[in-house]
UniProtKB/Swiss-Prot annotation:
It comes from the Eukaryota. It is an enzyme of class 1 (oxidoreductase). It comes from Sus scrofa. It is found in: Endoplasmic reticulum membrane; Microsome membrane. Inhibited by azalanstat. Inhibited by azole antifungal agents ketoconazole, itraconazole and fluconazole. The lineage of its organism: Eukaryota, Metazoa, Chordata, Craniata, Vertebrata. Pathway: Steroid biosynthesis; zymosterol biosynthesis; zymosterol from lanosterol: step 1/6. This is Lanosterol 14-alpha demethylase.
Length: 503
């Protein structure tokens, strides 16, 4: 969930927002002028509010000048962010700064420079200042980036305790069953939007595994739309614009948040009143307490369940879809993955088990290589609260400090044949293997994703089932380009061809 696909057409977000809110009459024009002025003042305060001077004698990172006031490099970056960053790396080295929309971003490229961000303390490089205004309206108050970091760390520890191997063993059969039922509607052959299908399936499987059977049983088309509206809160407009604007997407997000919370409250209260103890994550949270002995409130449990689902939904759905296209492009590799199913699980392909899943090494490497070339989140960010020194430069407070997994995971200094999809590269020595932060699709350090192991279980189970059901092909050789206009870098026009395997 990152900014930085921001404003491809300069002020387009502002313009579109105002078009949604206002009409064409005189009153509307006046309201537009007032709102636009307020937004400019708001953005200006956001831009300069945290800036502080450097200590005497400190050297600033190289700064990429732009003649365009305020917008800076937003247009060029928005059109081709990876190319922009790789060109800057070649010219300026691993640390450099530039301005977009009145904010200064300092990028740390390469493992050594990235270590500053991943090894930092929250009081020095702060995550809440970057992410809270985006996540709090979606997850709710009192959880995640809306609370002091020590409290958030306690909440993550509670969630992580529920993401254990005992639960994963249960999840495999649940995910396999959901996947088979979902693809019954696909028939024998056809062409479908793979990303849309997998996004729906990821929600179904994650809700069943992570929320429990009570909440999953209520997941109908209406509730699925509520999730989509809530997920729509992760947008460039939500990052850039003040939350009080009456945008339709903001209203849909807030309504969905209230309605989903009400569904969760009923399930939570029913579970609290029940004498039955079900071994799942919902029960884990209900039984958890903070260090001071205080139990979680219903509102905290509901917010954490929303966060657990939506934070992982993007990673799993995007990665699953991209891997499908990589396998469709390389039919030999796809067939090897299918044959691995028979080798590991048996010729008759019985129901999957967690232990078998662990032995699907080729499929595991395919996921790993997909995450290398197409990490869902292009940039991880922190707000500098204190001066930070790296590679001989000092980053002042107020800069947004960034690491790009996408760039780090394809640097030619670290990766051999860096743009090739080659799952077998992990069987050999790579320069990157000796670099701690050359491969970070799930982050690292204090903010490493706690759902990484569940994501692997989910994706491996779904794709094991899909490979048993179908063969996949590109349509007329089309391999999707990356859609950089969205917060998560999804495949563009992700339609794939499929045919049911013969028995």
């Amino acid at each position: 969930m990152v900014l930085l696909g921001l404003l491809q057409a300069g002020g387009s977000v502002l313009g579109q927002a105002m078009e949604q809110v206002t009409g064409v009459n005189l009153l509307s024009s006046l309201l537009l002028a007032c709102a636009f002025t307020l937004i400019l003042v708001y953005l200006f305060r956001q831009a300069i509010g945290h800036l502080a001077p450097l200590p005497a004698g400190a050297k600033s990172p190289p700064y990429i000048f732009s003649p365009i006031p305020f917008l800076g490099h937003a247009i060029a970056f928005g059109k081709s962010p990876i190319e922009f960053l790789e060109n800057a790396y070649e010219k300026y080295g691993p640390v450099f700064s530039f301005t977009m929309v009145g904010k200064t971003f300092t990028y740390l490229l390469g493992s050594d420079a990235a270590a500053l961000l991943f090894n930092s303390k929250n009081e020095d490089l702060n995550a809440e200042d970057v992410y809270s205004r985006l996540t709090t309206p979606v997850f709710g108050k009192g959880v995640a980036y809306d609370v002091p970091n020590p409290v958030f760390l306690e909440q993550k520890k509670m969630l992580k305790s529920g993401l254990n191997i005992a639960h994963f063993r249960q999840h495999v059969s649940i995910i396999e069953k959901e996947t088979k039922e979902y693809f019954q509607s696909w028939g024998e052959s056809g062409e479908r939007n793979l990303f849309e299908a997998l996004s729906e399936l990821i929600i179904l499987t994650a809700s069943h595994c992570l929320h429990g059977k009570e909440i999953r049983s209520q997941l109908n088309e209406k509730v699925a739309q509520l999730y989509a509206d809530l997920d729509g809160g992760f947008s460039h407009a939500a990052w850039l614009l003040p939350g009080w604007l009456p945008l339709p997407s903001f209203r849909r997000r807030d309504r969905a948040h209230r309605e989903i919370k009400n569904i969760f409250y009923k399930a939570i209260q029913k579970r609290r009143q029940s004498e039955e103890k079900i071994d799942d994550i919902l029960q884990t949270l209900l039984d958890s307490t903070y260090k001071d002995g205080r139990p979680l409130t219903d509102d905290e449990v509901a917010g954490m369940l929303i966060g657990l689902l939506l934070a992982g939904q993007h990673t799993s759905s995007t990665t699953s879809a991209w891997m499908g296209f990589f396998l469709a492009r390389d039919k030999t590799l796809q067939e090897k993955c299918y044959l691995e199913q028979k080798t590991v699980c048996g010729e008759d392909l019985p129901p999957l088990t967690y232990d078998q899943l662990k032995d699907l090494n080729l499929l595991d490497r395919c996921i790993k290589e997909t995450l290398r070339l197409r990490p869902p989140i292009m940039t991880m960010m922190r707000m500098a609260k204190t001066p930070q020194t790296v590679a001989g430069y000092t980053i002042p407070p107020g800069h947004q400090v960034c690491v790009s997994p996408t760039v780090n995971q394809r640097l030619k200094d670290s990766w051999v044949e860096r743009l090739d999809f080659n799952p077998d590269r992990y069987l050999q020595d790579n320069p990157a293997s000796g670099e701690k932060f050359a491969y970070v699709p799930f982050g690292a350090g204090r903010h490493r994703c706690i759902g990484e192991n569940f994501a692997y279980v989910q994706i491996k189970t779904i794709w094991s089932t899909m490979l048993r059901l179908y063969e996949f092909d590109l349509i007329d050789g089309y391999f999707p380009t990356v859609n950089y206009t969205t917060m998560i870098h999804t495949p563009e026009n992700p339609v794939i061809r499929y045919k049911r395997r013969s028995k």
